[in-house]
Amino acid sequence: VLNPGRTVDAIEPGFHNDPRRSLYHWYFLRKWRRSLTLKSRLFPGLIDLDAVRQHPSIRSLTEYFVPRYTEFACADDYLSGYAVTGSRLAGLKIPATIIASADDPVIPARDLGQVARPSCLCLEKHSHGGHCGFIPDFRMESWINKRLETLFQPRDKSQGGPDE
């Protein structure tokens, strides 16, 4: 996620007419509620499940939880707290790569232009890839697996790195 607030907005009902985004909203909200139900069983009294059921969206549920369970006053402060847009990555000192897709229905591609670009940051923007790992067919094979293997290979000391 580059800008969590904009990602939440991208999948919220009413912000779009893209059925893929509605599917993601349904999936994430269902998964979050299931997790909260499990936590309430493990920690009785911690979570008010009746209140959880009253929130029909990820944004409204985030707005409910943030002031109650975090040090942030509101959802927007919380969401912007872990955004990597703006100058957040300007001080990056180690090699890093962001791999993104222009057609991702969840993470707006226009947010890539809002990311600081220190010399150690590589930004790979691809035309297609969606949100699920650049899967081109029903065999579930993707070039991204090989790309990640390459990225996570140990670096040669002559290439520089944090130990220098």
Predicted regions and their residues:
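Alpha/beta-hydrolase-fold enzymes
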Residues: 1-69
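Active-site nucleophile elbow and catalytic-triad environment of alpha/beta-hydrolase enzymes
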Residues: 67-88
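Conserved alpha/beta-hydrolase "acid-adjacent" motif
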Residues: 83, 101, 105-111
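Short, conserved loop/helix-junction motifs that constitute active-site signature segments
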Residues: 89-92, 114-118
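Short beta-strand/loop motif that positions the catalytic acidic residue
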Residues: 92, 98-100
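Short, conserved active-site loop motifs that form the nucleotide-linked donor/cofactor pocket
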Residues: 121
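Catalytic histidine-centered segment of alpha/beta-hydrolase-like enzymes
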Residues: 129-142
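C-terminal alpha-helix
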Residues: 147-158
